[in-house]
Amino acid sequence: MGKDKNPRRVAENEAMAKTRMLRTSPQKLNLVAQMIRGKKVDKALADLTFSHKRIAVDVKKCLQSAIANAENNHGLDVDELIVAEAWVGKNLTMKRGRPRARGRFGKIIKPFAEITIKVRQVEEQA
């Protein structure tokens, strides 16, 4: 009469990874996420490796974690994986200030974001 096991959040041919507290705005992070959506994982890793965006390094680490989860936890074939979904969300926002002229105070917003990457195994057509 114990508690039921939690249902699996992803399908049998999927795996996912999430990275939180990335020090960038969600808008900038989404530019990198759009770059890899729907691509094969080896092509996505190559694109992230040679991207000039600073946040691409962190997105690459998250994608490598999703690939490792697929291989080790779910037994999926790495050569048949694609980036099924990559979505970005807001996280907390640090609020800082800067003294300005005439006794005023300028507000500085330092946003954080999070990314979730889901990879899916697809069978190649012959």
Curated annotation (Swiss-Prot):
Top-level taxon: Bacteria
GO CC list: cytosolic large ribosomal subunit
One Pfam family, short name: Ribosomal_L22
UniProt xrefs under InterPro entries: Ribosomal_uL22, Ribosomal_uL22_bac/chlpt-type, Ribosomal_uL22_bac/org-type, Ribosomal_uL22_sf
Keyword entries, A-Z: Ribonucleoprotein, Ribosomal protein, RNA-binding, rRNA-binding
Matching PANTHER family: CHLOROPLAST 50S RIBOSOMAL PROTEIN L22-RELATED, LARGE RIBOSOMAL SUBUNIT PROTEIN UL22M
Function, as annotated: This protein binds specifically to 23S rRNA; its binding is stimulated by other ribosomal proteins, e.g. L4, L17, and L20. It is important during the early stages of 50S assembly. It makes multiple contacts with different domains of the 23S rRNA in the assembled 50S subunit and ribosome. The globular domain of the protein is located near the polypeptide exit tunnel on the outside of the subunit, while an extended beta-hairpin is found that lines the wall of the exit tunnel in the center of the 70S ribosome.
Record-stated family: Belongs to the universal ribosomal protein uL22 family.
Name of this chain's protein: Large ribosomal subunit protein uL22
Organism of origin: Dinoroseobacter shibae (strain DSM 16493 / NCIMB 14021 / DFL 12)
Lineage summary: Bacteria, Pseudomonadati, Pseudomonadota, Alphaproteobacteria, Rhodobacterales
Encoding gene, per UniProt annotation: rplV
